[in-house]
C-alpha cells in the first residue's frame, strides 16, 4: 500500500486520475528533470524546514540561470545561501530578503548579480496556490491605485 506522502495524483488530458510515484533512490534522482533556467520552489521558513539535502544535490548538479521561489533569501552560509553563493540563481522571488545574516544575498544584490522580485507573503502564498490549481492569475487589492501599481519597477 502506498503512503499518502509518496504518491500524488494528476489528471491526464482525458480527465483520468494517474498515480505518480514520488519515491526516488537519492536526492540527485529526485532532481533528474531539473534543467538550466528552471524555476525551483524551495520550502522552509528561515532555517526551519529547509530541504538541505536537496539543496546540496542541486548544488552538485551545477545548474545555472535558476529562478528560486522561497520565503526569504537564505541564512548564514548553508541551505539556500549556499546555493546562492554558487552563482546558480539568476532570480529570487521572495517576501523577506533581508535578515541579519543574509550577507550572501546582500553581496550578490549589491553587485547586481541577482534579480529580486519582492512579493508580499500573502500574495506569494496565493500565487503558489493559484499556480498549483492551474489558475491563470488572481486579483489582489495590494498596491491597487498606488504609484507601485503604475510603475512596478519603482520608476517615478
Where are these regions (language model features)?
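Conserved alpha/beta enzyme-core scaffold
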Residues: 15-156
Amino acid at each position: 500500500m502506498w503512503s499518502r506522502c509518496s504518491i500524488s495524483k494528476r489528471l491526464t488530458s482525458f480527465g483520468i486520475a494517474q498515480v505518480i510515484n514520488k519515491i526516488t533512490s537519492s536526492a540527485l534522482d529526485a532532481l533528474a528533470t531539473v534543467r538550466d533556467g528552471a524555476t525551483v520552489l524551495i520550502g522552509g521558513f528561515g532555517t526551519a524546514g529547509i530541504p538541505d539535502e536537496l539543496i546540496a544535490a542541486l548544488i552538485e548538479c551545477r545548474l545555472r540561470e535558476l529562478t528560486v521561489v522561497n520565503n526569504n533569501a537564505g541564512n548564514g552560509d548553508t541551505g539556500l545561501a549556499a546555493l546562492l553563493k554558487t552563482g546558480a540563481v539568476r532570480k529570487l522571488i521572495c517576501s523577506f530578503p533581508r535578515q541579519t545574516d543574509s550577507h550572501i544575498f546582500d553581496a550578490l544584490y549589491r553587485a547586481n548579480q541577482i534579480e529580486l522580485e519582492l512579493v508580499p507573503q500573502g500574495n506569494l502564498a496565493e500565487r503558489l496556490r493559484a499556480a498549483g490549481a492551474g489558475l491563470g492569475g488572481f486579483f489582489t487589492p495590494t498596491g491597487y491605485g498606488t504609484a507601485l501599481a503604475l510603475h512596478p519597477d519603482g520608476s517615478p
